[in-house]
Amino acid sequence: MRNNDAKRRSDLLRRRSAPLITPSELGAEASKDIAGGMNAVLTDVFALYMKTKNFHRHMSGPHFRDYHLLLDEQADQLYAMTDAIAERIRKTGGSTLRSIGHIARVQRVIDNDADYVEPLDMLAELREDNQNLTARLREVHEVVDEIRAIATASLIENWIDETERRTWFLFESSRRGD
């Protein structure tokens, strides 16, 4: 019985220490650069998703329905990005996020845990967060463009467009009529 337990433990330890490196023609240094930039973006996308869902759930006021639906749509779009980003990192030979703790340590999006936030303040805060995400995506695009990670650059271009659209909708939705 002891030998069987020792063998299982040995097998488990061996599997845990096995390298998780996907071969990539981009090379180890490029894979590291892609993973670094894309993981930073991924943490921000997860944090922005959570903030958007938080505001979606705690929306109140005369424009509740419109804002509630807008934020739900935007949160869905952000969540859809997460797996594509993580899989892109893995496809190019990198390692990606493993926990909520990892996200919390790296994210640059500032959480908002306030009990109440005015609806227009919610939209303004999300607009600013999306603008910052656009800037970060552009920074990573420069890196992947330089190392000719064409598929990664192409995905980032689409995400920039989606993020600019979210920013635009948040801006237009928060304008006050005269």
Residue ranges and their predicted role:
Residues 32-42, 46, 72-75, 79, ...:
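Short amphipathic alpha-helical segments with heptad-repeat character
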Residues 2-4, 64, 76, 96, ...:
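Long, contiguous binding/interaction regions
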Residues 87, 101-158:
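Acidic/histidine-rich alpha-helical segments that form the ligand environment
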Residues 59, 63-102:
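Conserved alpha-helical segments that form or flank metal/cofactor-binding pockets of metalloenzymes
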Residues 42, 49, 56, 75, ...:
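A structural signal for well-ordered alpha-helices, especially hydrophobic packing surfaces
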Residues 1-23:
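Acidic, low-complexity proline/glycine-rich segments
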